[in-house]
Amino acid sequence: MKVLNNLLYTGDHEWIRVEDNKAYIGISDCAQRMLSDIVFVELPEVDDEIAKGETFATIESVKAASDSYMPVSGTIVEINEELEDNPAALNEDPYGSWIIAVEMSDKSELEELIKPEVYEKICEELDKEA
């Protein structure tokens, strides 16, 4: 299981990579392993405004459907359209296959996210339970 040090994470297994006021958001390696074979991703629309904690995508696998929640509030400026034709990209490269990019409305919300070293321990515990 891989946890990247240049990202922040949520307890719901989303990751966020910040570039100035723009943030790319996806699901972690830990999440894609729990979901297993991803077959469909329901994406939001560009220009949608979504608050922190609200659902921004639904990811369906052969095992289950899972909502993904916004780690920060913002306006969607880009969606990863590749996922419409190739949802399995989230399994193959969860950190390269971002889901959405947002213009953040409150950067202070980043302070509430989980640091990589803490998130790694969370995932290790989940692996032990599996």
Swiss-Prot record:
Residue positions, PTM N6-lipoyllysine: 63
GO-annotated biological processes: glycine decarboxylation via glycine cleavage system
Residue ranges annotated for the Lipoyl-binding domain, each copy included: 22-103
Keyword Transferase in record: no
Segment forming the signal sequence: none
Cofactor binding note from Swiss-Prot or TrEMBL: Binds 1 lipoyl cofactor covalently.
Keywords from the UniProt entry: Lipoyl
Pfam assignment, any one: GCV_H
SUPFAM superfamilies reported in the protein's UniProt record: Single hybrid motif (SSF51230)
Cofactor or coenzyme needed: (R)-lipoate
Listed InterPro entries: 2-oxoA_DH_lipoyl-BS, Biotin_lipoyl, GCV_H, GCV_H/Fam206, GCV_H_sub, Single_hybrid_motif
Gene3D superfamilies with a match to the protein in the record: 2.40.50.100
PROSITE patterns (alphabetical): BIOTINYL_LIPOYL (PS50968), LIPOYL (PS00189)
Keyword Nucleotide-binding listed: no
GO cellular component: cytosol; glycine cleavage complex
Quaternary context: The glycine cleavage system is composed of four proteins: P, T, L and H.
HAMAP family: GcvH
Role played: The glycine cleavage system catalyzes the degradation of glycine. The H protein shuttles the methylamine group of glycine from the P protein to the T protein.
Similarity comment: family membership: Belongs to the GcvH family.
Record protein name field: Glycine cleavage system H protein
